[in-house]
Amino acid sequence: MIDASHYDFEKNIEITRRVVDYAHERGVVVEAELGKLAGIEDEVNVAADDARYTDPDQAYEFVQRTGVDSLAIAIGTSHGAYKFKGDAKLRFDILQAIKAKLPDTPIVLHGASSVIPELVEMCNNNGGNIPGAKGCPDEMLKQAGEYGVSKINVDTDLRLAMTAQIRRVFAEDPSVFDPRKYLGAAKEEIKATVAHKINNVFCSAGKA
């Protein structure tokens, strides 16, 4: 994965092309990103006002000029737990236009966690402070898959799953100090979250 999306279009192409050349010589596939997602990732902070949807024509040109194997696009998702201030909305029209131009290129969505309400509530009920956290509804993510998205990143949901259970364990029994107890609960919640995504949202079971 190479993300040079915070650079201008030509610089993004230049950096990505170098990575693709290096990786392909060694039999490694490359995912790149075009368009800007709001939020913070790897210490790169993009304000909501600076976020930018992916242009379908640029997406086609980007893939042709870089030779990248898969492309992460921006259609309204964002990094972190606060993805929408109002109603959730994704630009499926942009996604469809990109897939029409790049039918054989796997499309990726970053920042697409559901920010599962039950896990947010568990965090907040046990000493957490993440009011107003909101993500992409599962129904939208399922629709994205139906429109041709091949990979959906949901790191925030896994962070929430782990944190929610650790907070619950400590709140219910402050004397706990054995990592196996709180990490075990966290692991099971992560497993349940992943299973739910695979079976009910991405519908990807048995397709690896």
Task: Describe each PLM feature range.
Residues H110-S114:
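Short catalytic/ligand-gating loop segments at beta-alpha or beta-beta junctions
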Residues N125, C136-A208:
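C-terminal alpha-helical cap/extension of soluble enzyme domains
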Residues I2-P106, P117-M122, N126-K134, D138, ...:
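Alpha/beta enzyme core
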